[in-house]
């Protein structure tokens, strides 16, 4: 990638992409924005293109703390980040930062195109840290989680380091000429509106959850949390779920672990939905239960509650730590969560070591609702992945 603008052909941009390009190229920048065509190779594998993007100089280090070899991406912000910073990004909520793994998640060409369109860590930091004069306060690889949380929230959620005039740069959006242009990074007002909508969504279901489980922890505690691993949750399917519309429901699932929450897509008109959708969460210490909530999506009113359950992930995490470096090749049972009248299990949740992975299949009877069963699969991953 060129470090200057000499002998660089003009880049034709349009739509929301134009705003970001104008911002990044203004006032004689010291770098040239990446172009989608620069990363298009004869290979059609998105992962190959992603690996090539990761080798760009600015992307070799975490955008927030500078740790080398970041293995995580905030797709919605366009930055490569380390495992420690990824936990804070997840706590921001997917309406601000949607975190994916370079290695563990399946990538599409559209997602890589979107990432390329942001310009990489250098380009994004030029914008989000435009007024971050005191670089000494930026986290280092060995900074505490409290320091990371404070900086990352100020940077992406509160926009404290952005140029004040940045929000006025994109009052006009050029018409898009293609359907693959990445979302604009230029509209602070749009981002703020999106944040308010996201907060309203989280608060709406959070209040309903508090009716059953008590108040949530404040965000001020998020930075004091240490992360001990990752939990990969495959929401498989629901069976005989409750009716919340005339004769059916439009269900979706929310997973919450500490300050983090993620949700599946909505499946319309189905009491036996099959999601088969994989979601990822960081595991905090101390380790809270994994909360599972099911809702019916409504267009003109508050989403209806369809049941909930809690999962103790401590046995799975303990088993994963014990066998993290195991060379055992044959499938092996490591433990089980026994179904009883005291818990919500339909059948025993067996913890298995298979192909070097520690997994647990769980069938849950939803609580505080008239009926419904949810099947999920858990996998515990070490922080090194």
Swiss-Prot record:
This is Probable ADP-ribosylation factor GTPase-activating protein AGD11. The keyword Mitochondrion does not apply. A zinc finger (C4-type) spans 62-85. The keyword Transport does not apply. SUPFAM superfamilies: ArfGap/RecO-like zinc finger (SSF57863), C2 domain (Calcium/lipid-binding domain, CaLB) (SSF49562). It comes from Arabidopsis thaliana (Mouse-ear cress). Its cofactor is Ca(2+). Disulfide bonds: none annotated. Ca(2+) binds at residues 298, 301, 304. Residues 197-218 are annotated as: Disordered. Residues 212-326 form the C2 domain. Pfam families: ArfGap (PF01412), C2 (PF00168). The lineage of its organism: Eukaryota, Viridiplantae, Streptophyta, Embryophyta, Tracheophyta. InterPro entries: ARF_GAP_AGD11/12/13, ARFGAP/RecO, ArfGAP_dom, ArfGAP_dom_sf, C2_dom, C2_domain_sf. GTPase-activating protein (GAP) for ADP ribosylation factor (ARF). Residues 47-169 form the Arf-GAP domain. One of its GO terms (molecular function) is zinc ion binding. PROSITE patterns: ARFGAP, C2. Keywords: Calcium, GTPase activation, Metal-binding, Zinc, Zinc-finger.
């Amino acid at each position: 990638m060129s470090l200057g603008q000499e002998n660089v052909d003009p880049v034709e941009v349009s739509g929301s992409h134009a705003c970001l390009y104008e911002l990044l190229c203004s006032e004689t920048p010291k770098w040239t924005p990446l172009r989608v065509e620069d990363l298009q190779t004869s290979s059609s594998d998105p992962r190959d293109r992603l690996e090539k993007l990761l080798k760009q100089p600015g992307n070799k280090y975490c955008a927030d703390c500078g740790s080398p070899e970041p293995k995580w991406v905030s797709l919605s912000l366009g930055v490569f980040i380390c495992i420690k910073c990824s936990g804070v990004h997840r706590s921001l909520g997917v309406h601000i930062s949607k975190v994916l793994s370079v290695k563990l998640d399946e990538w599409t060409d559209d997602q890589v195109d979107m990432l390329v369109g942001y310009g990489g860590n250098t380009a994004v930091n030029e914008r989000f840290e435009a007024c971050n004069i005191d670089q000494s306060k930026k986290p280092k690889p060995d900074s505490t989680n409290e320091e990371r949380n404070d900086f990352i929230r100020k940077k992406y959620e509160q926009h404290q380091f952005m140029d004040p005039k940045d929000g006025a740069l994109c009052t006009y959006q050029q018409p898009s000429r293609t359907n693959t242009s990445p979302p604009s990074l230029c509209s602070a007002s749009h981002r703020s509106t999106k944040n308010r909508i996201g907060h309203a969504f989280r608060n709406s279901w959070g209040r309903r959850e508090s009716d059953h489980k008590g108040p949530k922890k404040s965000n001020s505690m998020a930075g004091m949390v240490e992360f001990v691993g990752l939990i990969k949750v495959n929401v498989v399917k629901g069976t005989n779920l409750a009716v919340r519309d005339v004769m059916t429901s439009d269900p979706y699932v929310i997973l919450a672990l500490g300050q983090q929450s993620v949700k599946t897509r909505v499946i319309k008109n189905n009491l036996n939905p099959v999601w088969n959708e994989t979601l990822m969460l960081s595991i905090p210490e101390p380790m809270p239960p994994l909360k599972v909530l099911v809702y019916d999506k409504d267009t003109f009113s508050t989403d209806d509650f369809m049941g909930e359950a809690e999962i103790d992930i401590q046995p799975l995490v303990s088993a994963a730590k014990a066998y993290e470096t195991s060379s055992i090749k044959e499938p092996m049972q490591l433990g089980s969560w026994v179904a009883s009248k005291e818990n919500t299990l339909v059948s025993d949740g067996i913890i298995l070591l298979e192909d070097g992975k520690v997994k647990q299949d769980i069938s849950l009877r939803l609580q505080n609702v008239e009926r419904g069963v949810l099947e999920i699969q858990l996998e515990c991953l070490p922080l090194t992945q």
